Amino acid sequence: MVYESSASSRCAAGPKIAAIGGGTGLSTMLRGLKKYTDRLTAIVTVADDGGGSGVLRREMGILPPGDVRQCMQALANTEPVMEQLLGYRFPEGQLKGQSFGNLLLAALNGMAGSFEEAVSMMGQVLAISGRVLPVTNADVQLEAVFENGARVVGESHIFNAKKQQDCRIHHVSLVPEHPKALPDALEAISEADLILLGPGSLYTSVIPNLLVDGVADTIRASHAQKFYICNIMTQDGETEGYTAADHLEALQRHGREGIVDLCLANNAPIPRGLAARYSEEDAELLRIDRERIAELGIALAEYPLLSAQGGYARHDPALLAQAVMELYRERTVRIYRGTQQYITEEQEWK
């Protein structure tokens, strides 16, 4: 059974969804989900300190706009040229590498006096479906602790540090610790019918949200369905050698048991040539270790979700949104502690 989107099914009748993460992964999913519901809230990490966002953060004292801007682009209901404009990066000069969308958000921040209000204003300008919220208004940095005890502060430094240490990340934390969550973000989570974590970089886009005071507690206390959208590939400098169960264990290590009920994973193969290119970058198709996932008491749903367009292995926005909404609508996942139910696209649910 397929959950088709339509003008009548999209709007107030759609479910309340809280999508938590950051970066390209979250924005990709939002592009698909906005066709099913307007009651969609993206809750976005603000720990980024690299690239154009890092420059604006250091020079203007604002929260990093990049991840928020990507989500805004995904949810925008404007002319295609406007979306292209938001993503445009200056090729030279003092603004080299900076995106117009980041600068627009920085300008709105100056007008509004707060990042939260600037994000709200940008949402109005772009007529977005749903809303985008920073998870916190606090100025935070991400600290990673490796299995050998070494530490590094700053999201942009984690990749090189992991290469130098040549071991896995044990855990991450925020500096300073225990920043307060945006009240609207906690409200969106508590009122959601469906809570989605990911897709996106595990330690630098997804987990940082769980470290903000109240976020993990509110997720666990919710009676909503809670899905983790597993990445298509492992990530060089962050999750080399990881399986789907490794991702889930990391989520539980940072957010405790009960943070997620179901893992949605891709089961489509990657084209051989693309796999070879990713292998050169120490990345591979994420392996689904079903027995370990079952031992964690988390349900597993497998769907073909891969898009290989443009030479990258990413989620197809339409396929991902369809899978999420189909699972939600049919309520085929039965949640029992310690019980595993396998779900594939070919099954007919009643």
Residue ranges: model-predicted function:
Residues V2-I62, G66:
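Gly/lys/ser-thr-rich phosphate-binding loops in alpha/beta enzymes
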Residues V2-Y3, G241-K350:
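C-terminal functional extensions of proteins
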Residues T24-L30, P199, T204-L211:
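Short glycine/serine/threonine-rich phosphate/pyrophosphate-binding segments
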Residues T37-D38, S222-K226, V260, I298:
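A short helix->loop->beta-strand "cap" motif at the edges of active sites that frequently abuts
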Residues T41-A47, Q225-I232, D261-A268:
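Short internal beta-strands
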Residues A47-D166, A323-E326, E330, G338-W349:
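Electropositive, gly/pro-rich neighborhoods at or near active sites that engage anionic ligands
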Residues A138-P199, Y203:
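Active-site gating loop/helix substructures
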Residues N209-A216, Y242-H247:
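Charged helix-capping and loop-helix junction motifs
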